[in-house]
Amino acid sequence: MSSHNPHSESPFNALPPVVVFLALAIAGVEIGLQLGQRGLLGGPEAVGWRLGLIQRFSVVPDLFRAMWAQGIWPPEHLLRLVAYPFVHASFGHAIFVIVFILALGKMVAEVFAAWAVLVVYFGASAVAGLVYSFVVPS
């Protein structure tokens, strides 16, 4: 006779810690923005935090084209390639991203080591940002 009790099973699949870390990082940014938007964090200027983060960390094709043309790569602009995945246009946008990170990240993390998952995540983000910069018409 088996001692397996189906009522004690978790309804969720176990998630690798690196995937949980990425999802919590995205959720943390979004929670901070939501609290600021509601006036519960950061004072009156917090209402504009999302727009400020988008302006500071979004991938701007004209900016990257100009950097390419001049051969100048300021670190504060290169940071955009790995920072933009943590800033989203809205709460709904962030939720969709978190769901996909949890689902797809679990599959990737089952095959790769934690450090490799981070390389895939940030590498894909950087490559996607550069491709976007040079494919989008000016």
Task: Please tell me what each predicted stretch does.
Residues 1-40:
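C-terminal transmembrane module of polytopic alpha-helical membrane proteins
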